[in-house]
């Protein structure tokens, strides 16, 4: 039976991923998050772990011996005032990479980045071409660079989700959909809205 570790398992994507895995696989799951799960039944997989705290992170990963790691833990809002406000994204991935290496059991890993490594409308020339327009985006650029520099020996990939919404979502989409559902949305002008993806 495969062992899957999910960081950020209490977040929007993590919650939906766990629900999907429970329906589609018999893999053994473990989730790390600083927040409690959104769904009570996920408590049996959850451990309160801050990925910036290396010793605890290493201890839990070495003990669990995961085959697969899906790294979703991140600060994703746009309210930070300095790049240091997004330290969980950068320092977190560095410490996770080190702990995974110490475990020596991981065969595959997926690291979540963001479409915000490039500003809306920018078409990157290659995977090293970045144009972030927010501090959050800058933190994800640095996150990607740290992963690439580490060049893990296991199979790995970086994904850049675009705007996503669905069950258990939060800011900013919950506000938008509340406006739409209450018939308070209106579109000004005749031009189409600009898409960022």
Listing of model-derived features with the role each one plays in the protein:
Residues 4-24:
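N-terminal Rossmann NAD(P)H-binding glycine-rich loop of SDR-like oxidoreductase domains
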Residues 7, 32, 69-73, 109-115, ...:
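SDR active-site strand-loop-helix element
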Residues 42-53:
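Rossmann-fold cofactor-recognition segment
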Residues 51-89, 102, 120-124:
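NAD(P)H-binding glycine-rich loop region in Rossmannoid oxidoreductase-like domains
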Residues 52, 84-95, 130, 134, ...:
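Glycine-rich NAD(P)-binding loop of the Rossmann-fold in SDR/ketoreductase-type enzymes
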Residues 75-76, 115-122, 130, 162-165, ...:
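Active-site segment of SDR-like NAD(P)-dependent oxidoreductases
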Residues 95-135, 149, 157:
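Conserved Rossmann-fold NAD(P)-dependent oxidoreductase catalytic core, especially the SDR/UDP-sugar
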Residues 152-197:
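NAD(P)-dependent short-chain dehydrogenase/reductase
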